[in-house]
UniProtKB/Swiss-Prot annotation:
Record's keyword terms, sorted: Mitochondrion, Ribonucleoprotein, Ribosomal protein
Organism: Neurospora crassa (strain ATCC 24698 / 74-OR23-1A / CBS 708.71 / DSM 1257 / FGSC 987)
GO biological processes: translation
Record's function text: Component of the mitochondrial ribosome (mitoribosome), a dedicated translation machinery responsible for the synthesis of mitochondrial genome-encoded proteins, including at least some of the essential transmembrane subunits of the mitochondrial respiratory chain. The mitoribosomes are attached to the mitochondrial inner membrane and translation products are cotranslationally integrated into the membrane.
Name the UniProt record assigns to this protein: Large ribosomal subunit protein bL17m
Highest taxon above the source species: Eukaryota
GO CC field: mitochondrial large ribosomal subunit
GO molecular function, one term: structural constituent of ribosome
Quaternary context: Component of the mitochondrial large ribosomal subunit (mt-LSU). Mature N.crassa 74S mitochondrial ribosomes consist of a small (37S) and a large (54S) subunit. The 37S small subunit contains a 16S ribosomal RNA (16S mt-rRNA) and 32 different proteins. The 54S large subunit contains a 23S rRNA (23S mt-rRNA) and 42 different proteins.
Length: 193
């Protein structure tokens, strides 16, 4: 049927293979809170991850069984999903994940790649980058741009003790005394996120 509306990305796989791929990506996302994959896979996995977190917020027996059918290791991840992650997103109406475009993963595969991450978590990339920008602005004694202020509001709005955690991160980054926005990757490990 030519010209039909595409409801989802097929990812050049059979239906069973595609479902297995997405379940594996979502299981890794819940386990590690961030994954690096291709952009189309990240966007499709994002849809399934959002549904899974919405199920965890319902916290019913039916929701637990549905989540158990999605995750590959439910015995390990259901307590995390229905505990820590459900509490983190209790007040957030949606948008539990974020897709950030990145450079291709290696020089041989030029497929567009992306990072899929859970927002407001300990590995939130936008939170860290916004804090680094604010720390740089304060170090250089310049006013933050409107975009930086908007991002600051976004990353702290639904986070528990958001502004306090953000200011702690900014203080940690200022103590590193980085120059021109460049931070040694070894210094990131010293941050207590």
């Amino acid at each position: 049927m030519a010209g039909a509306h595409v409801k989802y990305r097929h990812l050049s796989r059979s239906s069973a293979h595609r479902q297995a791929l997405l379940r594996n990506l979502v299981t890794s996302l819940i386990k590690n809170e961030t994954i690096h994959t291709t952009y189309p896979k990240a966007k499709e996995a994002q849809r399934l991850a959002e549904k899974l977190i919405t199920l965890s917020k319902r916290d019913t027996e039916t929701a637990r069984r549905s989540a158990q059918g999605i995750l590959y290791t439910p015995d390990q991840l259901l307590p995390k999903l229905f505990g820590e992650i459900r509490e983190r997103y209790a007040n957030r109406p949606g948008g539990y994940t974020r897709v950030l475009r990145t450079e291709p993963k290696d020089q041989y595969s030029q497929a567009p790649s992306a990072i899929l991450e859970l927002v407001d978590g300990p590995k939130d990339m936008r939170f860290a980058m916004t804090a680094a920008t604010v720390a740089r602005d304060r170090e250089q004694k310049t006013e933050s741009t409107d975009l930086t202020k908007k991002n600051m509001d976004k990353v702290t709005r639904f986070r528990k003790d958001g502004m306090r955690a953000f200011e702690d991160m900014v203080a940690s980054l200022r103590d590193m005394k980085f120059t021109a926005g460049a931070i040694n990757p070894k210094e990131w490990k010293k941050l207590d996120r």
